[in-house]
Amino acid sequence: MTPSELRRLYSIVRVLLSYGLDELIPKMRLTFPLRAGRRLLFWLPNRHRNMPLGERLRLALQELGPVWIKFGQMMSTRRDLFPPAIADQLAMLQDKVEPFDGKLAREQIELSMGGIPLEEWFDDFDIKPLASASIAQVHTACLKSTGKEIVIKVIRPDILPVIKADMRLMKRLAGWLPRLLPDGRRLRPREVVLEYEKTLLDELNLLREAANAIQLRRNFENSPMLYVPEIYSDYCSEGMLVMERIYGIPVSDVDALKANGTDMKLLAERGVQVFFTQVFRDSFFHADMHPGNIFISYEHPEDPQYIGIDCGIVGSLNKEDKRYLAENFIAFFNRDYRKVAELHVDSGWVPADTNVADFEFAIRTVCEPIFEKPLAEISFGHVLLNLFNTARRFNMEVQPQLVLLQKTLLYIEGVGRQLYPQLDLWKTAKPFLETWMKRQVGLPAVFRALKEKAPFWAEKLPEVPELFYDGLRQHKMLKHSVDQLAYELKTQQARQGQSRYLLGIGATLLISGTLLLISRVEADMVPAGLMAAGIVTWIIGWRRTR
């Protein structure tokens, strides 16, 4: 470790111990050095003894900074690793920090513009930030060319070295974990950290966020359900994002929404429809839809429209994942646990040699109590959570796209029930899922697939005669090769049969001569002749096997 890494490690240890998080170290022989080391650091007492463990963990991560805050947010979705009290606290982590100097933001913007003075492109730049987070902050301005109001998102100037240093430490810690914990290898800590690093570095590239927002805007163009602000891509770079400024009511401000006359039932149901449309129609979903990234338009409160911002994290599902997921939901709510178990095996999410009967029983044991509640009170997100946690006991591979989906579904469900507590999410989603499933089977689906593949076949059709001729020629050559191989195999088998016969005769003659010699028969030449003939015959047989 470098001196700077050692200093940072000491800083992390100091914060963790000040919140008494050493109690998370399991009491076992392998972890004795860690527990002994804790006693040596006697000058770092637990200063928050009266707080619950989950709250202490949340506060410690917030004190450690952006890398650890976002890691805690991600780990809040892994409820197979933490008890509910800790996972709930991790989900409350707030990604809010003090804004950095507006003059520095101005310098960063001009640097992203290639050194061009900010006034050449923008008017009315507000040096005071509109919003600030751990990765970036936002300033308002107007486009000089059109006068349109915009917001400029700019990456913090000092954030990259901090992130890289903390990620190096996190990887080292992940490498130690399997050696210290008996279950450490199954948890795959290194893979979890590498996945997190990729997500974090993606967020640092605002060109990626711009591309995601453009895609999402195109998917919901002219939609009454969701509006995505326009991105001005000519002004965007890795460190700067420029987009249309929007005005709306934060989705968490229920009182303001009601005061505006918003149809709360329709708004809650539309949130569910937006989510399932993104997942099943578009295979491209906004995976960071927490309340801070969702607003509601002031216009047409009787026909409310969502406004989505911050597309830094997105997810996607392939066709097979979508089909299996939809079938899982439908089978689960029909209480067909056998089907749920078979779908997990068929999809490859759990190993092919999984005992389906045992898996079905485990799913039934965990999920059947859920149906003691009315359907309107059943949580889709917790259904997924229970399914995945049960499947992990049967060696289910971690599916990053499903973890993102589960997290997003929990956000959407929480927001929906905050807006309209009587929201029946299953009743809203079931028609959508059943309609989507019907579109995937039958003649319409076949014709649609043919239409999608038409350009491919139009390109390949002229090559069909040549491919057909090549196939016939290769078939003829293959037949000749097979015949030749069969002949050689038959010859080899015949030679091996003769060899075994000669080896048997040689061994018989050799044994007979030896027995005669031992019995001291008077005709001494007979056993010697038999032994000599046996040796010669055995050698001939052995050579024919080569």
Swiss-Prot record:
The keyword Transmembrane helix applies. It is an enzyme of class 2 (transferase). The active site is at 288 (proton acceptor). It is found in: Cell inner membrane. Residues 124-502 form the Protein kinase domain. It is a multi-pass membrane protein. The chain crosses the membrane at residues 499-519, 521-541. SUPFAM superfamilies: Protein kinase-like (PK-like). CDD domains: UbiB. Its EC number is 2.7.-.-. ATP binds at residues 130-138, 153. GO terms for cellular component: plasma membrane. Keywords: ATP-binding, Cell inner membrane, Cell membrane, Kinase, Membrane, Nucleotide-binding, Transferase, Transmembrane, Transmembrane helix, Ubiquinone biosynthesis. One of its GO terms (molecular function) is ATP binding. GO terms for biological process: regulation of ubiquinone biosynthetic process; ubiquinone biosynthetic process. It comes from the Bacteria. Pathway: Cofactor biosynthesis; ubiquinone biosynthesis [regulation]. Belongs to the ABC1 family. UbiB subfamily. Is probably a protein kinase regulator of UbiI activity which is involved in aerobic coenzyme Q (ubiquinone) biosynthesis. HAMAP family: UbiB. NCBIfam families: PRK04750.1, UbiB. PANTHER family: CHAPERONE-ACTIVITY OF BC1 COMPLEX CABC1 -RELATED, PROTEIN ACTIVITY OF BC1 COMPLEX KINASE 7, CHLOROPLASTIC. This is Probable protein kinase UbiB. It comes from Pectobacterium carotovorum subsp. carotovorum (strain PC1). The gene is ubiB.
